[in-house]
């Protein structure tokens, strides 16, 4: 079994600290808004470029993936977004976790209680649900986000079977990112202030002409939850007991011949980069 895990990096120091294969996510020379999806855009690009093709499992993690999951386990956090996996997952532990669960299509590296993913996000990022609904409508995906109650995957902290990752990108991530950056009205919606508390990187502020984190990354990282639900994906969440399973609406492993949303962008003229 071959597992390929990429770590998304923005500096030399970050690259040097990576346990897994580093990927230099260079700031574009022009204001390409796809970049604002951050790790979700890296997933899209690498799948298009077939980085997953020779692997059984594939993942794109942030350079701080361990810290994010550990910080989310703080008991002072709001319960719905509190990581209930109390053990700090190590790189070796991650590989062993994947090896123990060959039945899973997706393996979440954290464990969160089930909650309405997009409705909760709206309380932190005003306008996120409305914008996501319009993006889905633009790519002909009909789904009531208010009824999406899921034990979620957060921070793009997941590993997937390579064919399942390709299905996710092909069916929802790629078309949504393209719609968000090509349609003038959708672009304006996505560029609104997300209300995220961290300071926007100065070099990005200069390039994109905004002083805040827009909605793009917070929409992108939540799409995996919509996909796993509709595809009937087998998802296992990391837990000190070894793993807790959940399934989408249909208890069937993902097959590239079976589409969660009834179509595949690969069959509609190929990828547009």
Tell where the protein language model's regions lie, with residue ranges:
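ER/Golgi luminal nucleotide-sugar-dependent glycosyltransferases, focusing on the catalytic module
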Residues: 1-273
């Amino acid at each position: 079994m071959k597992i390929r895990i990429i770590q998304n990096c923005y500096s030399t120091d970050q690259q040097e600290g990576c346990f897994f294969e580093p990927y230099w996510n260079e700031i574009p020379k022009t204001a390409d808004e796809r970049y604002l999806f951050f790790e979700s855009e890296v997933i899209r690009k690498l799948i298009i470029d077939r980085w997953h093709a020779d692997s059984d499992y594939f993942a794109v993690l942030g350079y701080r993936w361990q810290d994010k999951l550990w910080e989310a386990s703080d008991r002072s956090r709001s319960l719905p977004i509190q990581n209930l996996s109390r053990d700090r997952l190590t790189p070796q532990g991650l590989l062993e976790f994947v090896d123990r669960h060959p039945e899973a299509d997706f393996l979440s590296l954290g464990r969160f209680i089930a909650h309405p993913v997009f409705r909760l996000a709206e309380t932190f990022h005003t306008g996120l649900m409305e914008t996501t609904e319009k993006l889905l409508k633009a790519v002909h995906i009909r789904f009531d986000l208010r009824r999406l109650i899921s034990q979620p995957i957060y921070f793009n902290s997941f590993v997937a079977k390579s064919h399942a990752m390709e299905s996710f990108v092909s069916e929802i991530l790629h078309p949504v990112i393209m719609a968000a950056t090509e349609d003038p009205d959708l672009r304006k919606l996505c560029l609104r202030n997300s209300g995220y508390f961290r300071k926007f990187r100065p070099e990005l502020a200069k390039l994109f002409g905004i002083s805040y984190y827009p909605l793009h990354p917070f929409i992108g990282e939540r799409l995996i939850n919509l996909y796993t639900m509709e595809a009937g994906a087998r998802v296992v969440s990391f837990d000190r007991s070894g793993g807790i399973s959940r399934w989408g609406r249909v208890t069937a492993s993902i097959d590239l011949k079976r589409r969660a949303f009834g179509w595949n962008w690969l069959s509609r003229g190929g990828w547009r980069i």
